[in-house]
Amino acid sequence: MDMAGLKACATTMMILVASIAPGATKSPVADAVMNGDKTALRTLLQQKADVNAPQVDGATALHWAVYRGDVDAVNQLVRAGATIDAANREGVTPLAMASLYGQAAIIEALLDAGGNAKQVTANGETLVMFAARNGNPAAIKLLAGAGVDVNAKERLRGTTALMWAVEQRHAPAVKMLVELGADVGARSGPAGLPRNYMAPRVDTTAVEAAARRHAAAAAAGRTYNEQLEWEAAHGVKISLGFRGTLNADGTPARVDNARRPFGQPAAPAPAPAAAPPPDDAADDADVIVAGLVGAGGGGLTPLIFAAREGDLESAKYLIAGGADVNQTSEYGWTPLLTAANNRHYKLGAYLIEHGADANLANKGGWTPLYLATDNRNIEGGDYPVPKPDMDHLEFITVLLDHGADPDRRARDNTLTRTIFTMQWFYENGATPFVRAAQSSDVELMQLLLDYGADPFIATENGDTALTASAGIGWVEGVTYERSPGDNVDAVRMMLDLGLDPNASNKEGRTALMGAALKGRNEVVQMLVDRGAKLDTRDGGSRDTDNSVSAIAGHRWQAIDYADGLVRVGVQSAITRPETASLIRKMMTDRGLEVPPANRVMESICVVSICQERVWKD
């Protein structure tokens, strides 16, 4: 958050409340400082007015002097007996505000006057963390010199001041913290959403709170909406602090997120029961939350934060301070993987130059090479796509030159996959070559071949680079393709390499079926000319259970895909009349049985179980 944002928060906290109830308390000194009226302040101090009289929200004159950055007013108030560590109703002290604003001169004045540098928030956030977020090295040095532990972790996410500075891209603050002994290898605590937390500033709080609400609703036998209505009627709100223990009626039996004053230590946690019952409600709730939110995230280091933010300068200070360039998060994200995922290729190249392993993969099996390939051919979606700071192909070449294995296989769909694509193309086992082929990225495919890529490696579901390029997994308006011309060239390349035009995946789908669904006549013709069979049948689409398909005759041919009878994944079927005409002609020329044109789904019993066969297998 920048200075304008910080002051906006303070304004909301102090001015708004005061404006709601003017005159609710008598605080002329605070009012004078709030208004910047130096003459009135001088007069009031001469009259021995109470410098500690708070406004309605608890803000004192010293709070306002800090907010305005008025060092002279701070010194005048201190000499007049202002309480240094007075807290407003939010528990915020003047020293905390000065730390958040990075006001080194005011911090020094307050510390000299006896301010408590070791005060912490309810979540364990220290004043050094506040100063790190602002980025003023001088403020950080003053607070650390006053005894604040630079390696303390806040309790909500387990982050340190060094992580806060890196997350805000404050390289000078990072340098100062490293010099003061900050742990460059510290790890954040566990977190939910393990596959998604690498995106900058993902807010998992709302997701987790919703998950715990689902858990509470399930325990009480209510729907989610009924739970919301029940909470509103009973004045209950299940939030992040809710641990899941419920009363018999579904009310939270314990809520541990009550606010306490800034600097006051948290109450000790109650001792755990010696032997919790097997059906403990908290355990049940946590199981539900784990399924809704996820597990295995967290464990981010300062260098991983720097890689996520693309902060090359901070990364340099961290590496110079001894950070391991191959450290991993709980999910297996390395700094290099993180930089590649977020398209911070210059930082990635720097990491490689300093020993980063180009082949380390996370638990999803994603390598820097696979992610860079995916980034170059990103599919359409409702998410922002950052611009890379280096050409994709240039970075990929850097990876390959430093030993990246072009045949390393992914184990899971990448973050960019939408629900549409994942429904009928599974990346488990896909190589960078298969991913490049899916988008007909001929230039990258050739580069990978030049570095020894094996074009014959298929996915665990049996899809080859040929089936992927031809159209298996294609989602209209979503899947990215370099161009229709590149699609023809990619298919030709793979046929020339010797890939089997009749190879099918575990659903029985072939390259010809994919080309028919896409409506690519030139590809269809090329595949048939190279031996692709027109009468091959798949294992049945989502509209017919596989066990019924064999009985009802609903195992589809390429012509059915072109006729728009086959729905794949969650997308609707698409009719390709010109492609259907071409396939019918080729089937007729070869003496194959040709199904009638102008068919619709209901006419061949796709919606309900068929009563009779339409054709023989």
Specify the residue positions occupied by each region the protein language model found.
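Conserved ankyrin/ankyrin-like repeat signature
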Residues: 40, 72-73, 105-106, 138-139, ...
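Ankyrin repeat boundary signal
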Residues: 53-54, 84-87, 117-120, 150-154, ...
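Short, low-complexity intrinsically disordered segments enriched in A/P/G/S/L with frequent Arg
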Residues: 8-9
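Ankyrin repeat start-site detector
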Residues: 56-57, 89-90, 122-123, 156-157, ...
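Ankyrin repeat domain, specifically the short helix-to-loop turn at the C-terminus of the second helix
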Residues: 45-50, 75-83, 108-116, 141-149, ...
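Acidic/polar low-complexity surface segments
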Residues: 186-205, 221-293, 365-366, 371-379, ...
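Ankyrin repeat A-helix N-terminal signature
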Residues: 31-35, 64-70, 97-103, 130-136, ...
